[in-house]
Amino acid sequence: MMQRCLRLQKPLALRRGLHLAQVNSQAVTTEAPEAEPLDAFERQYLKERIEISPFQRLFLGAGSSIAALLNPRRHDMIACLGETTGEDALWTILDTMQASEEGQRIMADKPRIHTSTIDFKYLETLPPDTFGAAYVKFLKDNQVTPDSRMAVRFLEDPKLAYLMTRYRECHDLIHTVLDMPTNMLGEVAVKWVEALNTGLPMCYGGAVFGAVRLRPKQRRAYLKHYLPWALENGKRAKPLMPVYWEKRWEQNIHELRSELGITVLNKA
Protein backbone atom coordinates (compact mmCIF):
# COMPACT_ATOMS: atom_id res chain seq x y z
CA MET A 1 0.00 0.00 0.00
CA MET A 2 2.87 2.37 0.80
CA GLN A 3 4.31 1.73 -2.65
CA ARG A 4 1.02 2.69 -4.25
CA CYS A 5 0.80 5.94 -2.27
CA LEU A 6 4.31 6.89 -3.33
CA ARG A 7 3.52 6.07 -6.93
CA LEU A 8 0.44 8.28 -6.91
CA GLN A 9 2.48 11.25 -5.80
CA LYS A 10 4.52 11.19 -9.02
CA PRO A 11 3.23 12.75 -12.22
CA LEU A 12 1.71 10.15 -14.51
CA ALA A 13 4.22 10.66 -17.30
CA LEU A 14 7.13 10.19 -14.89
CA ARG A 15 5.59 6.99 -13.53
CA ARG A 16 5.77 5.65 -17.08
CA GLY A 17 9.31 6.97 -17.61
CA LEU A 18 8.12 9.73 -19.97
CA HIS A 19 8.63 13.46 -19.94
CA LEU A 20 5.38 15.42 -19.89
CA ALA A 21 6.15 17.00 -23.26
CA GLN A 22 6.65 13.56 -24.79
CA VAL A 23 3.41 11.85 -23.78
CA ASN A 24 1.77 12.16 -27.19
CA SER A 25 4.83 10.99 -29.12
CA GLN A 26 5.83 8.34 -26.53
CA ALA A 27 9.48 9.42 -26.89
CA VAL A 28 11.67 8.07 -24.10
CA THR A 29 14.76 9.85 -22.80
CA THR A 30 18.04 7.99 -22.49
CA GLU A 31 18.09 8.58 -18.73
CA ALA A 32 14.56 7.31 -18.10
CA PRO A 33 13.69 3.62 -17.64
CA GLU A 34 11.93 1.81 -20.45
CA ALA A 35 8.30 2.90 -20.51
CA GLU A 36 5.27 0.67 -20.78
CA PRO A 37 3.76 1.32 -24.23
CA LEU A 38 0.57 3.33 -24.35
CA ASP A 39 -2.36 1.72 -26.11
CA ALA A 40 -4.91 3.58 -28.24
CA PHE A 41 -7.31 4.26 -25.36
CA GLU A 42 -4.54 5.57 -23.12
CA ARG A 43 -3.08 7.85 -25.78
CA GLN A 44 -6.48 9.34 -26.56
CA TYR A 45 -7.34 9.75 -22.90
CA LEU A 46 -4.11 11.59 -22.10
CA LYS A 47 -4.86 14.03 -24.90
CA GLU A 48 -8.37 14.76 -23.65
CA ARG A 49 -8.18 14.50 -19.87
CA ILE A 50 -8.47 17.59 -17.69
CA GLU A 51 -5.66 18.04 -15.17
CA ILE A 52 -6.77 19.23 -11.74
CA SER A 53 -4.91 19.99 -8.51
CA PRO A 54 -5.63 18.19 -5.21
CA PHE A 55 -7.57 21.27 -4.05
CA GLN A 56 -9.62 21.32 -7.24
CA ARG A 57 -10.31 17.60 -6.84
CA LEU A 58 -11.53 18.18 -3.29
CA PHE A 59 -13.65 21.15 -4.38
CA LEU A 60 -15.17 19.24 -7.31
CA GLY A 61 -15.88 16.23 -5.11
CA ALA A 62 -17.69 18.31 -2.50
CA GLY A 63 -19.59 20.39 -5.03
CA SER A 64 -20.67 17.45 -7.17
CA SER A 65 -21.85 15.49 -4.14
CA ILE A 66 -24.10 18.37 -3.07
CA ALA A 67 -25.41 18.89 -6.59
CA ALA A 68 -26.08 15.16 -7.05
CA LEU A 69 -27.91 15.03 -3.73
CA LEU A 70 -30.14 17.97 -4.63
CA ASN A 71 -30.83 16.63 -8.12
CA PRO A 72 -30.13 12.91 -8.72
CA ARG A 73 -30.81 13.45 -12.43
CA ARG A 74 -27.64 15.54 -12.78
CA HIS A 75 -25.68 12.75 -14.42
CA ASP A 76 -22.79 15.12 -15.07
CA MET A 77 -22.42 15.75 -11.34
CA ILE A 78 -22.72 12.06 -10.53
CA ALA A 79 -20.00 11.32 -13.09
CA CYS A 80 -17.76 14.02 -11.61
CA LEU A 81 -18.35 12.65 -8.11
CA GLY A 82 -17.32 9.18 -9.24
CA GLU A 83 -14.04 10.40 -10.70
CA THR A 84 -13.06 12.70 -7.83
CA THR A 85 -13.79 10.21 -5.03
CA GLY A 86 -13.18 6.79 -6.56
CA GLU A 87 -9.42 6.55 -7.10
CA ASP A 88 -8.63 4.25 -4.17
CA ALA A 89 -11.49 1.91 -5.08
CA LEU A 90 -10.33 1.87 -8.70
CA TRP A 91 -6.81 0.79 -7.66
CA THR A 92 -8.40 -2.10 -5.77
CA ILE A 93 -10.51 -2.97 -8.82
CA LEU A 94 -7.36 -2.92 -10.96
CA ASP A 95 -5.76 -5.44 -8.59
CA THR A 96 -8.87 -7.61 -8.95
CA MET A 97 -8.72 -7.36 -12.74
CA GLN A 98 -5.07 -8.37 -12.82
CA ALA A 99 -5.74 -11.34 -10.54
CA SER A 100 -7.92 -13.14 -13.10
CA GLU A 101 -7.26 -14.24 -16.67
CA GLU A 102 -10.56 -12.76 -17.84
CA GLY A 103 -9.79 -9.44 -16.17
CA GLN A 104 -6.32 -9.36 -17.72
CA ARG A 105 -7.85 -9.85 -21.17
CA ILE A 106 -10.20 -6.94 -20.57
CA MET A 107 -7.31 -4.67 -19.57
CA ALA A 108 -5.33 -5.77 -22.62
CA ASP A 109 -8.20 -5.41 -25.11
CA LYS A 110 -9.97 -2.44 -23.46
CA PRO A 111 -13.29 -3.21 -25.18
CA ARG A 112 -15.94 -0.50 -25.44
CA ILE A 113 -19.71 -0.87 -25.34
CA HIS A 114 -21.43 1.32 -27.93
CA THR A 115 -23.85 0.78 -30.78
CA SER A 116 -20.80 1.10 -33.04
CA THR A 117 -18.90 -1.72 -31.32
CA ILE A 118 -21.65 -4.22 -30.50
CA ASP A 119 -23.48 -6.15 -33.24
CA PHE A 120 -27.02 -5.69 -31.97
CA LYS A 121 -28.54 -7.29 -35.05
CA TYR A 122 -26.66 -10.45 -34.14
CA LEU A 123 -27.79 -10.25 -30.51
CA GLU A 124 -31.40 -10.06 -31.70
CA THR A 125 -30.98 -13.45 -33.39
CA LEU A 126 -29.87 -15.20 -30.21
CA PRO A 127 -32.24 -17.50 -28.26
CA PRO A 128 -34.30 -15.62 -25.66
CA ASP A 129 -32.62 -17.35 -22.72
CA THR A 130 -29.14 -16.06 -23.65
CA PHE A 131 -27.44 -13.11 -22.01
CA GLY A 132 -27.18 -11.23 -25.30
CA ALA A 133 -30.90 -11.53 -26.01
CA ALA A 134 -31.73 -10.47 -22.45
CA TYR A 135 -29.51 -7.39 -22.86
CA VAL A 136 -31.28 -6.33 -26.07
CA LYS A 137 -34.66 -6.84 -24.39
CA PHE A 138 -33.54 -4.74 -21.42
CA LEU A 139 -32.50 -1.85 -23.68
CA LYS A 140 -35.80 -1.94 -25.58
CA ASP A 141 -38.03 -2.36 -22.53
CA ASN A 142 -36.37 0.53 -20.69
CA GLN A 143 -35.78 2.68 -23.78
CA VAL A 144 -32.09 3.24 -23.03
CA THR A 145 -28.98 3.23 -25.21
CA PRO A 146 -25.36 2.28 -24.48
CA ASP A 147 -24.25 5.52 -26.15
CA SER A 148 -25.43 7.77 -23.30
CA ARG A 149 -22.47 7.40 -20.91
CA MET A 150 -20.32 10.44 -20.16
CA ALA A 151 -16.61 10.36 -20.94
CA VAL A 152 -14.10 10.20 -18.08
CA ARG A 153 -12.03 13.39 -17.76
CA PHE A 154 -10.56 13.94 -14.28
CA LEU A 155 -8.62 10.78 -13.38
CA GLU A 156 -4.83 10.93 -13.65
CA ASP A 157 -3.96 7.35 -14.55
CA PRO A 158 -5.36 6.13 -17.89
CA LYS A 159 -5.78 2.59 -16.60
CA LEU A 160 -8.05 3.88 -13.85
CA ALA A 161 -9.80 6.03 -16.44
CA TYR A 162 -10.53 2.93 -18.48
CA LEU A 163 -11.88 1.11 -15.42
CA MET A 164 -14.26 4.00 -14.70
CA THR A 165 -15.27 3.99 -18.36
CA ARG A 166 -15.80 0.25 -18.19
CA TYR A 167 -17.91 0.58 -15.06
CA ARG A 168 -20.17 3.15 -16.72
CA GLU A 169 -20.55 1.23 -19.95
CA CYS A 170 -21.30 -2.04 -18.12
CA HIS A 171 -23.97 -0.52 -15.88
CA ASP A 172 -26.83 -1.64 -18.14
CA LEU A 173 -25.30 -5.12 -18.32
CA ILE A 174 -25.46 -5.28 -14.52
CA HIS A 175 -29.11 -4.24 -14.71
CA THR A 176 -29.65 -7.07 -17.19
CA VAL A 177 -28.01 -9.83 -15.18
CA LEU A 178 -29.80 -8.61 -12.03
CA ASP A 179 -33.12 -8.32 -13.92
CA MET A 180 -33.69 -4.80 -12.58
CA PRO A 181 -35.47 -1.97 -14.46
CA THR A 182 -34.19 1.60 -14.67
CA ASN A 183 -36.85 3.16 -12.44
CA MET A 184 -35.76 4.71 -9.14
CA LEU A 185 -36.37 1.52 -7.16
CA GLY A 186 -34.38 -0.57 -9.62
CA GLU A 187 -31.54 1.95 -9.78
CA VAL A 188 -31.19 2.11 -5.99
CA ALA A 189 -31.12 -1.69 -5.75
CA VAL A 190 -28.48 -1.96 -8.49
CA LYS A 191 -26.40 0.76 -6.82
CA TRP A 192 -26.29 -1.28 -3.61
CA VAL A 193 -25.05 -4.34 -5.50
CA GLU A 194 -22.45 -2.23 -7.35
CA ALA A 195 -21.34 -0.52 -4.13
CA LEU A 196 -20.69 -3.75 -2.28
CA ASN A 197 -19.13 -5.35 -5.37
CA THR A 198 -16.82 -2.51 -6.43
CA GLY A 199 -16.36 -0.34 -3.33
CA LEU A 200 -16.90 2.85 -5.37
CA PRO A 201 -18.00 5.68 -3.04
CA MET A 202 -20.38 7.14 -5.63
CA CYS A 203 -22.30 3.84 -5.66
CA TYR A 204 -22.76 3.99 -1.90
CA GLY A 205 -23.89 7.60 -2.21
CA GLY A 206 -26.36 6.76 -4.96
CA ALA A 207 -27.75 3.85 -2.95
CA VAL A 208 -28.19 5.79 0.29
CA PHE A 209 -29.41 9.12 -1.03
CA GLY A 210 -31.41 7.61 -3.88
CA ALA A 211 -33.48 5.69 -1.35
CA VAL A 212 -34.42 8.96 0.36
CA ARG A 213 -36.30 10.03 -2.77
CA LEU A 214 -38.45 6.91 -2.99
CA ARG A 215 -42.19 7.40 -2.68
CA PRO A 216 -43.90 5.83 0.39
CA LYS A 217 -45.14 2.77 -1.50
CA GLN A 218 -41.75 2.30 -3.15
CA ARG A 219 -40.00 2.72 0.18
CA ARG A 220 -42.06 -0.06 1.76
CA ALA A 221 -41.20 -2.41 -1.10
CA TYR A 222 -37.58 -1.28 -0.92
CA LEU A 223 -37.18 -2.00 2.79
CA LYS A 224 -39.10 -5.28 2.70
CA HIS A 225 -37.82 -6.83 -0.52
CA TYR A 226 -35.33 -4.85 -2.61
CA LEU A 227 -32.82 -3.81 0.05
CA PRO A 228 -32.36 -7.28 1.63
CA TRP A 229 -32.06 -8.82 -1.84
CA ALA A 230 -29.53 -6.19 -2.99
CA LEU A 231 -27.39 -6.51 0.14
CA GLU A 232 -27.36 -10.30 -0.13
CA ASN A 233 -26.37 -10.26 -3.81
CA GLY A 234 -23.83 -7.49 -3.33
CA LYS A 235 -22.04 -9.48 -0.65
CA ARG A 236 -22.31 -12.89 -2.29
CA ALA A 237 -21.73 -12.19 -5.99
CA LYS A 238 -18.31 -12.71 -7.53
CA PRO A 239 -16.46 -9.57 -8.69
CA LEU A 240 -18.39 -8.28 -11.70
CA MET A 241 -15.79 -5.91 -13.16
CA PRO A 242 -13.51 -8.77 -14.39
CA VAL A 243 -16.40 -10.36 -16.32
CA TYR A 244 -15.80 -10.08 -20.08
CA TRP A 245 -19.49 -9.57 -20.84
CA GLU A 246 -18.96 -9.33 -24.58
CA LYS A 247 -17.68 -12.92 -24.56
CA ARG A 248 -20.82 -14.09 -22.76
CA TRP A 249 -23.55 -13.11 -25.25
CA GLU A 250 -24.32 -16.74 -26.18
CA GLN A 251 -24.26 -17.99 -22.58
CA ASN A 252 -27.51 -19.04 -20.95
CA ILE A 253 -28.40 -16.17 -18.63
CA HIS A 254 -29.53 -18.51 -15.84
CA GLU A 255 -26.18 -20.31 -15.97
CA LEU A 256 -24.38 -16.96 -15.99
CA ARG A 257 -26.25 -15.82 -12.89
CA SER A 258 -25.47 -19.10 -11.16
CA GLU A 259 -21.79 -18.76 -12.07
CA LEU A 260 -21.66 -15.22 -10.65
CA GLY A 261 -23.64 -16.04 -7.51
CA ILE A 262 -26.60 -13.84 -8.46
CA THR A 263 -30.25 -14.50 -7.68
CA VAL A 264 -33.22 -12.68 -9.21
CA LEU A 265 -35.73 -10.88 -7.01
CA ASN A 266 -39.28 -12.21 -7.19
CA LYS A 267 -41.18 -8.97 -7.85
CA ALA A 268 -44.64 -10.57 -7.71
Swiss-Prot record:
It is found in: Mitochondrion inner membrane. Its cofactor is Zn(2+). Lyase that catalyzes the C1-decarboxylation of 4-hydroxy-3-methoxy-5-(all-trans-polyprenyl)benzoic acid into 2-methoxy-6-(all-trans-polyprenyl)phenol during ubiquinone biosynthesis. It comes from Drosophila sechellia. Pathway: Cofactor biosynthesis; ubiquinone biosynthesis. Keywords: Lyase, Membrane, Metal-binding, Mitochondrion, Mitochondrion inner membrane, Ubiquinone biosynthesis, Zinc. Its EC number is 4.1.1.130. Zn(2+) binds at H171, D172, H175, E187. This is Ubiquinone biosynthesis protein COQ4 homolog, mitochondrial. Pfam families: Coq4 (PF05019). It is an enzyme of class 4 (lyase). GO terms for biological process: ubiquinone biosynthetic process.
